[in-house]
Amino acid sequence: MTLTRRQLVAAFPAAIAAGLPRAARAEGGRRVVTFWFGQANSDGQAALRNDLVEAFNVSQDKYLLQLEVKGAAVNNLLKIALLAGNGPDIVQTAGPAYLTAIANAGQVLPLDDFAEKYKWKERFLPALLNTSVYGGKLYALPRDYESMHLFYNKDLFKQNGWKQPTNRADLEAIAEAALAEGIVPFGAGNADWKGVNEWLMTVFFNNVAGPDNVRKALSGELPWTAQPFVEAVELSKAWFNKGYFGKNYFSLTVEQSFLQVVNGKAAMALSGTWAFGTKSYGMSKPDTVMDVMSVPTLGSAFTGSLVHLACGATLSIAKNSQNPEGAAAVFEFMLTRKFYETMNRDWPGKWALPIKDLSPEMLRGIGFPLFETTIASLHDAFSKGQYGFTTWTFWPGATNSYLIEGIEQVWLNKITPDAYLTRMQTLFSQEAKEGKVPPLPPRAA
């Protein structure tokens, strides 16, 4: 039976009812592959529907991909479903820090056989692929690669004679000048996503303490209570209390706060490459007011600027999946050039698969110059081992949860930086003993 275009599109929002038997379902002679996705705005949902679900379903006649957008609750829903032996065939997590728990619990399949069949290990950047290797086995593919960046309103910079900052002194000079003009230095808000806290702390830990010290701490060679990390937390508190992140951090959403920069109400934003995927920011337009750069040093540990190695999401196959071959076929489809170009054109930054062979022609096919140059520079830095470490990729789960929640207590003067880091070290030590710290990529030669 050949499905019509309408039938294929209809498969996108198909409900995946709780408690369905685990036997693989079939529709129209095809074996169904189920996939739950987290948050996606209207542009993202359209890209998922057109560039992934429909495109995969028309590319072959053996499997039928059904995807359901679950929203912010997806992590909890997945956790419950996996414990019950139900849930989707394709398991997406919010990064290796989240993958560790389900891999250790045996809730996802090793992908080594599929990796050998499809030559995945030869096609992905090792620094990203290795973040999903536990006990010598590959449990996930990285869906994307990300980094924190400094986005800024280039028109506002020009009007005020501000130059690209190269160090902490430069950044703080711009911040103070902005405050004097009634401009928010950094557009920021976590009303709809507490994870903004860890975006900022990724920058402070790496750009103050330095990536070498962060690596040592993640390896257990240096405690989180060491002075470089105290200085990082103290600087984050100082900036928050000076008003560098505005007066409405807890009431503004991510989009509202970034639009402050676009509209000239704020000068800069510390955000990630995923920001390219929000069309309201207008960064794909030739006349965009926005520009972007890597984040400059904020301490004495290094000079210059730094990108931060991140895998924003991982893709695994559930242990109880009755259609692992179909799920692997979806992964293989995601590695096609057409998918890379169309998905990154329609939803930039959300599906920048960390493939080794990222040709200039592929990037030009996206048609988004600012995104293309940023991704190309990231690809180069990650290939050469020149990067810091993001919390959502390399911190273990409980430690990272406390990092996010506890830092607000520091900023609001309820606990000291020392108390915050002492608690973090306690949690980290316990998780390290339990083997829950995500693997680190090898040091660059």
Regions found by a protein language model. Name each.
Residues 88-89, 118-155, 184-188, 302-308, ...:
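A structural signal for short loop-to-beta-strand junctions that line the ligand-binding cleft
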